[in-house]
Amino acid sequence: MANPLRKTMVYLGLADEELDYQQGQQPAQQQQSPVQAVPTPAPAPQQQAKRAPVTPLHKPSTTTRNAAPAEMNEILTVHPKAYKDAQVIAENFREGVPVIINLSQMTDDDARRLIDFASGLSIGLYGKIERVTAKVFLLSPSHVAVSGEQSATEAEVEASFFGR
């Protein structure tokens, strides 16, 4: 009798059912005929299924484009009251508009969080972030040049703000 695993495999269709013959009861044909090699038929050519045109998963994004160096027509000044105002800053900076951020109406924790966001934004879009006063920052795109000197007191203020 076959083992239970073999029976289960046959039941599930994972193996062919083999008849268990005792050695003395084998069919006469198998004893008389010599083993012959059966020629393997050539594989039939498979028809190529028509494929549908491929559509890209990701649409071309305008967020990675660099702002075109154009004539500067405006500078945006933002007085954020909460972190959610960062979206306005990001949208305008992405368009190539320099943004002045006045943090005087924000708490220190929210101001730090917004400056961290603005720093990442400026680095990601190859811009620059500069401190103008203790709570005012300038985000300038890569095509905008800002000139001026940084005094010793401004350097101390910058160190005290970021050194917390």
Swiss-Prot record:
Chief place of localization: cytoplasm
Signal peptide range: none
Pfam families for this protein: SepF
Upper lineage: Bacteria, Bacillati, Actinomycetota, Actinomycetes, Micrococcales
Descriptive protein name: Cell division protein SepF
Subunit details: Homodimer. Interacts with FtsZ.
One cellular component (GO) term of this entry: cytoplasm
Family from the record: Belongs to the SepF family.
UniProt keyword list: Cell cycle, Cell division, Cytoplasm, Septation
Biased composition (Low complexity): 22-54
InterPro entries per the UniProt record, alphabetical: Cell_div_SepF, Cell_div_SepF/SepF-rel, SepF-like_sf
Functional description taken from the UniProt entry: Cell division protein that is part of the divisome complex and is recruited early to the Z-ring. Probably stimulates Z-ring formation, perhaps through the cross-linking of FtsZ protofilaments. Its function overlaps with FtsA.
Chain segments carrying region Disordered: 21-71
Domain of life: Bacteria
GO terms for biological process, alphabetical: division septum assembly; FtsZ-dependent cytokinesis
Localization in the cell: Cytoplasm
